[in-house]
Amino acid sequence: MYSLIKKSISTIALSTLAITSLPTYSVSSQTTEEYGARKYFINNNIENIKNIENKSFDLVQNLNTKILEKENIETLSGTVVDFTKEATVTSNSTIPNGLIIEKSNINITAGKGYDLSSEMGSEYVKALEKGTIIVSYKSTSNNSIQSLVSIGNNTSGNRDRHFHIYITNTGEVGMELRNTDSVLKYTLSRPAAVRSIYKNNLVFNTIAFKADPNNKQYKIFANGELLATLNTDVYKFINDITGVNNVMLGGTVRDGVIAYPFGGTIGNVKIYNEILTDEALKAETGATTYGKNIFYAGDSTKSNYFRIPSLLSLSSGTVVSAADARYGGTHDSKSNIDIAFSKSLDGGITWKNPTIPLQFNDYVAKNIDWPRDSIGKNVQIQGSASFIDPVLLEDKETKRLFIFADAMPAGIGSSNASTGSGYKDIAGKKYMKLRWHQDGSSTYNYSIRENGVIYNDVTNLPTEYKIDGDYNLYKNGIALLCKQYDYNFSGTTLLETVTNVDVNMNVFYKDSLFKVFPTTYLAMKYSDDEGETWSNLNIVSSFKPENSKFLVLGPGVGKQISKGQYKGRLIVPLYSSSYAELGFMYSDDHGQTWNYVAADNRNTGSTAEAQIVEMPDGSLKSYLRTGSGVIAEVTSINGGETWSDRVTVPNMHTTSYGTQLSVINYSGLIDGKEAIILSAPDSSSARINGKIWIGLINDTGASGINKYSIEWKYCYSVDSSNMGYSYSCLTELPNGDIGLLYEKYDSWSRNELHLKNILKYETFSINELKKPISN
């Protein structure tokens, strides 16, 4: 028999405070002046008697009961004791499984919030030791942090006792679980996770969070994707927060004041005493998705991370795309990076599984989650060769598709490349130079001659070694092999270890018998069947100046001149250091040979990534990233062989370090004029605030480089001004719409390293993009 004995007390309220192996209950006396306000903590694994003004009551094990206030209580048997006013004692063992609270269509004014504390089911929410929360929302606020759902202790002195799910105005999603920081503070977040605006309208996002005691794990989802996971040694949840008394939408009540105010609409919120599956949460949050992922974590590339978009519509109507498949997080080279490729046969609606046309196999290609903590996020793969920064280009006369990328030898990137071309001049011809692995680091006594035969340059005689079309090494006609490397983390230390897997030995690999000079190279392949098959690898950068540290591609697309004296010429943007920042290579024989031209005499080493458009007479304009906080324009009237001085593009803002941009010609007329379309972030503080500008081409009546001017008439915002926007690539789709493949995050921010599925593909009609520039 259970008993509770008390005489003439106004209210007794019981609530779960914490759960270890057994629940602990608080018994609150909120009474008349005679008894005062007192709180008693009774551990239910012992029968206790506490005195209240010399009166006593017992709380016994397994008391989970509703208590109703009544005068002159007498001893009752059983598990329910009646008082006259309802209060609740709850442990997780009595919380019903499944959905325990749901609300829909709640409009919230920022700073007001919406209190759920008295809603049916809220008493269960306050005692959860596991669960799932799903919330859809549309924010109208620009507050930096906005709580969507919070559960906590709102009384004075308890400001750090709460759990909340929040968003930021930069697109971050996160959660905090706190019971004063010295006792408990778990945080989990993912930047660049949600959006604010899509096609000129504020939009809903759907977020899910689950707390799983079985795996000691927390997960966050949004818009169809698993964003982040936190594994803990000691699992905690709502029931571990002292004195929970508040459930709130649209803010977190701290010391009686609403903090982190959200303004907008909560479309729906559901709280479960149940751990829903990842698949179910991806499906439910996928109700709000915007754009597509052509390349995504877990696809056929086996990469978790993608950067550097390239997008091109072919003359046949096929749309092709390329990107870096980055296996070592989102780091640049040096790293393990290949070039992924995909194509669409229906105008960009659906995309084929990606393939890898440019790939080194010295390091395994695998899905690995790169750490994002303050130490691990900076760790890079040290020994791998890599391809980086793709460029796509079609020769419309031959229908040949080219793909270019920078080729980096093992352990090399632009930052640590050696000055020099990587070639030597022998009898008036340039040959790639090689070092025998046992020779000194500066001794390059060998070269690759005709038919891939390796010569000893000291004797000028052929050796028994040669390379094939992909620079793999052979001896006496037999392919040489080396062991492939794997990479795994032990804490924040990256271990690069030799495996038992044999791969073809390549002169770009660190374990090759012959090694190329450790600088940057320009790689090219071509396809005559729209990317179904590819040619052998061609290294085309023998023209790299000897005083250049690096000569690399301006990623995006190349250009073929379609009219005028230089009709048919192929041209690809480059940039360098220590010689000229901006440069180009061009071909007049359909890509058989290439010539290099420097477009300036600057030597500050700024990243002058450029893209090219054609004027109505066949002259060219190139728009480029600079290191001076502006986007620049240069003009060529001789097919790209020489270029004008830089002119600043007005009213476009960029950071001091700049960002790659995309610019294309539009085939039709806009407002009766030929036009170009440009994509870039528009901010001087970060890679944020993506814009698409439409520029009308005006004939000034002048001649030479001043013949055409650009009237930047329209400007479309891809998302709100705080949302990340980095590298991008535009194309005109077969139906006349504009396709955009872009990095939807701030790729410069160290806080946004190693994010999955940030390469987004979206389409727009010209009418959607025609938003007049506001003065």
Describe each PLM feature range.
Residues V80, A110-E176, N273-A280:
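Extracellular glycan-recognition modules
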Residues E176-T206:
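Short, aromatic/His-centered strand-loop micro-motif at the edge of beta-sheets
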Residues L230-T265:
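Flexible glycan-contacting loops in extracellular carbohydrate-active proteins
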